[in-house]
């Protein structure tokens, strides 16, 4: 999600320049995490827990890497400002991630690309693995760390890699048949 990535980048720029306008810009941009999709934000609720959408519209895309980037941006914003408002948005999102993590999990081996109905391509999966590892470390949430470890490509045997590749090909092609052409 660009909001989270941009917040993280602007916080780092602020640390280099001392320009407080950058922090104000981050806080203004972070307000989308407090608004529902219907109200022009990125906030949704699933199973009673908050999630942040990379693509805020219906049907909900539920793209994992965008959600993870949003959490890292909120973490950076809170760490810099100490504003409990952003800590609360971060905590709500982490609780939503923990409660809904199975949604993005393929048999404890790989990650799904949101609601698109196919497994993540390898480069997206590696990104999900790394971001989830970072969030597990930042939060101390063991469930995030365990899931990240289960997604480690280097820990997969030949049969698991073959299964993942075949399921990826099948689900990717099936999704292409379902999705309307632009």
What feature does the model see in each segment?
Residues 25-45, 85-109, 146-163, 173:
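Long, well-ordered core segments of solenoidal/helical folds
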């Amino acid at each position: 999600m660009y909001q989270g990535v941009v917040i993280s980048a602007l916080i780092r720029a602020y640390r280099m320049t001392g320009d407080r306008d950058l922090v104000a810009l981050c806080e203004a941009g972070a307000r989308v995490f407090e608004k529902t999709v219907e109200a022009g934000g990125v906030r949704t609720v699933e199973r009673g827990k908050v999630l942040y959408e990379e693509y805020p519209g219906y049907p909900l895309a539920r793209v994992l890497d965008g959600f993870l980037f949003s959490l890292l941006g909120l973490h950076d914003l809170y760490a810099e400002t100490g504003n409990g408002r952003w800590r609360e948005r971060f905590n709500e999102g982490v609780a939503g991630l923990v409660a809904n993590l199975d949604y993005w999990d393929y048999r404890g081996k790989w990650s799904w690309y949101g609601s698109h109905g196919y497994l993540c391509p390898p480069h997206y999966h590696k990104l999900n693995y790394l971001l989830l590892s970072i969030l597990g470390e930042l939060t101390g949430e063991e469930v995030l760390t365990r899931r990240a470890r289960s997604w480690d490509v280097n820990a997969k045997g030949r049969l698991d890699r073959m299964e993942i590749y075949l399921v990826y090909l099948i689900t990717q092609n099936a999704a292409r048949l379902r999705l309307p052409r632009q």
